[in-house]
Amino acid sequence: MTTSCSSQVRQNYHQDSEAAINRQINLELYASYVYLSMSYYFDRDDVALKNFAKYFLHQSHGGRGHAEKLMKLQTQRGARIFLQDIMKPERDDWENGLTAMEFALHVVKNVYQSLLELHKLATDKNDPHLCDFIETHYLHEQVKAIKELGDHITNLHRMGAPEYGMAEYLFDKHTLGSSES
């Protein structure tokens, strides 16, 4: 049974913000889905780059966590969550680590741009709580992710990827593998 009663706790939470948060939830879930696809591509026996697989699985969990945090915000603010279909990743075969990292950078930049637009909307609607939430939980983390992916792409290029197959193996082992605890 669904109910469409108005919320008792909703205060200073514009409908446009509610709708934008629902779109952001979908975008975060899409990013998680893309990273999950990448993770299991690199985990295949004919690709066998386990640290690429672990790296993208970690990113997938992060994207899902971001979506869940936004869902929690919606319920705390008295809004309603309206989930949408999650778009399928644009490809199933990621070809190589460089291609995957470049696409991941594209995804994270899209997520960041969407967060900036959400922050502007919150500012325009005079919602300091939403502005603070986005600043505290998302913006800095996205900037760090963009820098990290950019560094990985630079290093893969520098090592000769994708033409030099050993580059991905060495990057997987020494760069992504060095973050293991």
Swiss-Prot record:
InterPro entries: Ferritin, Ferritin-like, Ferritin-like_diiron, Ferritin-like_SF, Ferritin_CS, Ferritin_DPS_dom
Catalytic activity: 4 Fe(2+) + O2 + 4 H(+) = 4 Fe(3+) + 2 H2O
Residues the record lists as Phosphoserine modifications: 179
UniProt subcellular location: Cytoplasm; Lysosome; Cytoplasmic vesicle, Autophagosome
E.C. code: 1.16.3.1
PROSITE patterns assigned to the protein according to its UniProt record, in alphabetical order: FERRITIN_2 (PS00204), FERRITIN_LIKE (PS50905)
Pfam family, one: Ferritin
Gene Ontology cellular-component terms listed: autophagosome; cytoplasm; cytoplasmic vesicle; lysosome
Top-level division of the source organism's lineage: Eukaryota
Modified residue annotations for N-acetylmethionine: 1
EC main group: oxidoreductase
Domain Ferritin-like diiron: residue ranges: 11-160
Record key words, sorted: Acetylation, Cytoplasm, Cytoplasmic vesicle, Host-virus interaction, Iron, Iron storage, Lysosome, Metal-binding, Oxidoreductase, Phosphoprotein
Residues modified to N-acetylthreonine: 2
GO terms (BP aspect): intracellular iron ion homeostasis; iron ion transport; negative regulation of ferroptosis
GO molecular function: ferric iron binding; ferrous iron binding; ferroxidase activity
Assembly information from the UniProt record: Oligomer of 24 subunits. There are two types of subunits: L (light) chain and H (heavy) chain. The major chain can be light or heavy, depending on the species and tissue type. The functional molecule forms a roughly spherical shell with a diameter of 12 nm and contains a central cavity into which the insoluble mineral iron core is deposited. Interacts with NCOA4; NCOA4 promotes targeting of the iron-binding ferritin complex to autolysosomes following starvation or iron depletion. (Microbial infection) Interacts with classical swine fever virus protein NS4B.
Family: Belongs to the ferritin family.
Functional note: Stores iron in a soluble, non-toxic, readily available form. Important for iron homeostasis. Has ferroxidase activity. Iron is taken up in the ferrous form and deposited as ferric hydroxides after oxidation. Also plays a role in delivery of iron to cells. Mediates iron uptake in capsule cells of the developing kidney. Delivery to lysosomes is mediated by the cargo receptor NCOA4 for autophagic degradation and release of iron.
Protein name: Ferritin heavy chain
Organism: Sus scrofa
Gene this chain is encoded by: FTH1
